[in-house]
Amino acid sequence: MVSLPTLVFVHGAWHGPWCWDLVIERLSGVDIRAIALPSSGHDPSKLGDLYNDAEIVRSIVADVDGPVVVCAHSYGGAPVTEALVGVRKVRHLVYLCAWQGNVGDSLLGARHGIPPPWWEMHEAEGYIDPLRPREIFYGDVDPPTAKAAIARLGHQSLAAVSQPLTQASWRNISSTYVICEKDCAIPPAAQEQMARRAHRVKRLDTSHSPFLSRPSRVADILRNELRAAAAD
């Protein structure tokens, strides 16, 4: 039996490795690493930036013995895109309603410097908080699960969403884009545009957080991607 690659999870803004727990429970037998990005956290004075995040992603992947598939959610697509150019052990990237930007792009720059109305900006302190997270992130998540997730959200580094990508790993690593068709954080139309950069496109009829609303479906998609990567 062919062994599967290691799966590395990279969370999005305001979140942490905890957001993957329900998916991880459904991936028995898979070697998994869930990264904590320094740009998200509960102490605004200690938040890192995009390049700190990319360094962590590179470091965790480097520590894996064998092939790797990386799954990024939302903002997590930015450090993954930045970090993995030339890392040959990475067999495939999965962008789960994630930011698959190009060289020179930043999340804020993609909006011409105008933040979404649901970003609460703390520019002097260098961080952002989400307004209306229940509506924006968790529209199809059951109320107890959504409430627990909201209680765990941290602050997000403003620098991380302002800094440009200096390289794009999806140019030399194959990728799958998973479009979330009821997403209120990253508009599905924007996801459709980014998905043109991917080798495969899948769709979920979910909000921005399918790892909470449809964890079994996300796990199925990822197991299939791991099998495909192992067979290549």
Regions found by a protein language model. Give the residues of each.
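Conserved HGGG/HGGXW glycine-rich cap/lid loop of the alpha/beta-hydrolase fold
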Residues: 4-43, 68, 86-89
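Active-site loop/oxyanion-hole signature of alpha/beta-hydrolase fold enzymes
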Residues: 37-69, 84-85, 108-112
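Gly/Ala-rich beta-loop-alpha elbow adjacent to hydrolase catalytic centers
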Residues: 71-76, 80
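Flexible "cap/lid" loop of the alpha/beta hydrolase fold
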Residues: 85-130, 157-161, 166, 186-187, ...
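Conserved alpha/beta-hydrolase catalytic His-Asp/Glu region
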Residues: 126-169
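Catalytic His-Asp charge-relay segment
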Residues: 173-179
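Conserved loop-alpha-helix segment in the C-terminal half of the alpha/beta-hydrolase fold
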Residues: 180-205, 209-212, 217, 224-225
